[in-house]
Amino acid sequence: MTVQPLSRESVEKTVEPIILDCLRRFGDFSKPGIAAEEFAKLVEGELRPDVRRISLLVCLAQSATGPDSKGEGLELGCGYGYLLLPMAVFNPHIRWTAVEHPSRNYFNRAEFRQTLQDHNCQLVGCNITHEPLPFPDAKFSVLTFSETLEHLPVERLNFVLDEISRVIRPGGLLIASSPNQASLENRLRLLKGNSILDLPNPLPTAKDTFPHIRLYTPSEMSQLMQVRGFSLVSCVLESNNSTYRDVGRKSFRKTLYRLYELAEQRLPSLRRFGDTWFMVFRKNK
């Protein structure tokens, strides 16, 4: 029997309440104990970029692995569980392990750990920029690495990618996403004389973690993984960041960004200017 691929729309309907719940319960800036209804109204419409990002990553994973795939999965930099929990829901036969920096506020919270356990996910603490991943070689059949690359100090990039390569088994998958250095937004910022990066100062919410200190293009990521014995399976570029523009939900600037995103979805020639790239690599056997 042929299994129909998941529709993006159906995945979005599943992941949105998961993301909303994770942010409400574990977010660094969320009011402790806030009711679900109150929080939903507070962030109404603001989670669209995350919902779109996670839904696309889930669809790419399903396309590359199939719905009945088995084995060990690893997420580097699990954050509040935005991606980890949906991956566990849509890939129930994969045993997921999450790696997170142990200084994050939610890392030792019993509620956070219990939520991961309820989804059959294990949590491991590791400062990935300075410590080897605490796993044997070739352990994982799939590894997700979303919105983490851009936070890495440049001098530690090769160390982290070498560790990623080490723990993925031959034939295994790396599913990654990161802001696109060559996006239209970044080009416009540079033309205005503005920087596209944050200063490399540690984040106040966790020791030895950083904001966006280096962005990469899809071609750079391809080169970085090719020299480590990976082949590109698929690459998608997409913009979903109009939600973040201006304060008013109906502002003119925000409307222009939304119109551009709609145009980008319909004109393939514009997609190379997308805000975020999504790439799937397979480790050569």
Located regions from the model:
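A short acidic, Gly/Pro-enriched loop at the edge of an enzyme's catalytic core
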Residues: E131-L143
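Conserved alpha-helix/loop element of class I SAM-dependent methyltransferases that forms part
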Residues: P49-S69
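S-adenosyl-L-methionine-dependent methyltransferase catalytic module, highlighting the catalytic core
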Residues: Q4-I54, Y82, H101, Y106, ...
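Conserved class I S-adenosyl-L-methionine
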Residues: S69-G79
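Conserved SAM-binding motif I beta-strand of class I
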Residues: R95-E100
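A short beta-strand submotif of the Rossmann-like class I SAM-dependent methyltransferase core
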Residues: F145-T148
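A short helix->loop->beta-strand "cap" motif at the edges of active sites that frequently abuts
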Residues: H93-I94, G172
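Conserved SAM-binding loop of SAM-dependent methyltransferases across substrates and taxa
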Residues: Y80-P92
